[in-house]
Amino acid sequence: LLVSHTFVKVRLDFLGSANRLVRVQKLLQTQILPVEKSILWDFVSVPQNLNEIPPPDMAFEIVGDHPERAYAGLLLEYRVKIPLMGWTPWLTEIKYVEEGVSFVDEQRVGPYSLWIHRHSLLEVEGGTLMTDEIRYALPLGPLGKISHFLFVRRNLESIFRFRRQALEKIFSN
């Protein structure tokens, strides 16, 4: 598990509001799974399979119908239960797909000011290297900074550790 956090200030424009600087965090996880890239792609590119990899204590559900495969322009709606906030809607858009190699999802509505998640696969000796690279920023200025320090960072790390273990279990055979 390789998790890193970097602090980068970027200028964002939210729905026509004045530009502002935000602190962007980066979470990076890599893992090698003992499976062919095409088999792993067939799993990670199916929206329904998102239900297979969150921790059991994380309340997460996909809302509505979803297609068999992710494609550029696809909007996916979820409900996520966040401590102290309750059920929160989350809408992501698949912005980019390179079939069999990678895709990028970006939050459109949800708990973050910024959420960009790049999923990529690379054939390596012994299987497939899967990389999750997430760039995210929290709203609420100093309060967001405090919540990141107190629980958001650890919660994300825990979610991705569980996801790593779930994928190892799914593809261990």
Identify what each model region corresponds to.
Residues 4-9, 13, 20:
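Short, positively charged and aromatic/hydrophobic N-terminal segments
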Residues 14-71:
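Hydrophobic ligand-binding cavity/cleft-lining segments
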Residues 40-44, 50, 76-78, 94, ...:
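Hydrophobic pocket/interface hotspot
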Residues 61-109, 165, 169-173:
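Glycine-rich portal/gate segments that line the openings of hydrophobic small-molecule binding cavities
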Residues 104-158:
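Beta-strand/loop substructures that line and gate deep hydrophobic ligand-binding cavities in soluble
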Residues 158-166:
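A non-catalytic, amphipathic alpha-helix used as a structural packing/dimerization or gating element
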